Amino acid sequence: MTELCPVYAPFFGAIGCASAIIFTSLGAAYGTAKSGVGICATCVLRPDLLFKNIVPVIMAGIIAIYGLVVSVLVCYSLGQKQALYTGFIQLGAGLSVGLSGLAAGFAIGIVGDAGVRGSSQQPRLFVGMILILIFAEVLGLYGLIVALLLNSRATQDVVC
């Protein structure tokens, strides 16, 4: 082991791999739960709106897929002999998609809950809810793009 390739370098990559899936799953779970509560509350009086109002739950689930993609990519590039640079890049990629997915899940949950409740009373609010949900979903997509760019730079010319 050299100073560029210490024995603990893969630990940072493993933490990046775990944080990608953990934080995006937390965001997706919050978004699903918060939107689901709004759907259940509105479908008591308007059961015909169930399938129309399921959009926030689907969009919250997509956030977890972003974390899964990055987690699998980081996991496949983990190695026993790895540069510290690579471990830090993998950690950054995992945190990038994970924390942006957490924020996107929170936004989707809050907007989905309020939007579903509002659109059951005023159907014209549905289009506005969808537009706001798209902007919230893009927050997670930004983190995915940054994570993929970081992961593509993880294998530099450092030889262990």
UniProtKB/Swiss-Prot annotation:
Changing E137D: Partial inactivation. It is a multi-pass membrane protein. Residues 1-8, 75-90, 151-160 are vacuolar. The chain crosses the membrane at residues 9-31, 54-74, 91-112, 125-150. One of its GO terms (molecular function) is proton transmembrane transporter activity. The record marks E137 as: Essential for proton translocation. One of its GO terms (cellular component) is Golgi membrane. Keywords: Hydrogen ion transport, Ion transport, Membrane, Transmembrane, Transmembrane helix, Transport, Vacuole. It is found in: Vacuole membrane. One of its GO terms (biological process) is endosomal lumen acidification. Residues 32-53, 113-124 are cytoplasmic. InterPro entries: ATPase_proteolipid_c-like_dom, ATPase_proteolipid_csu, ATPase_proteolipid_su_C_euk, F/V-ATP_Csub_sf. Signal peptide: none annotated. Proton-conducting pore forming subunit of the V0 complex of vacuolar(H+)-ATPase (V-ATPase), a multisubunit enzyme composed of a peripheral complex (V1) that hydrolyzes ATP and a membrane integral complex (V0) that translocates protons. V-ATPase is responsible for acidifying and maintaining the pH of intracellular compartments. V-ATPase is a heteromultimeric enzyme composed of a peripheral catalytic V1 complex (components A to H) attached to an integral membrane V0 proton pore complex (components: a, c, c', c'', d, e, f and VOA1). The decameric c-ring forms the proton-conducting pore, and is composed of eight proteolipid subunits c, one subunit c' and one subunit c''. This is V-type proton ATPase subunit c. It comes from Saccharomyces cerevisiae (strain ATCC 204508 / S288c). The gene is VMA3.
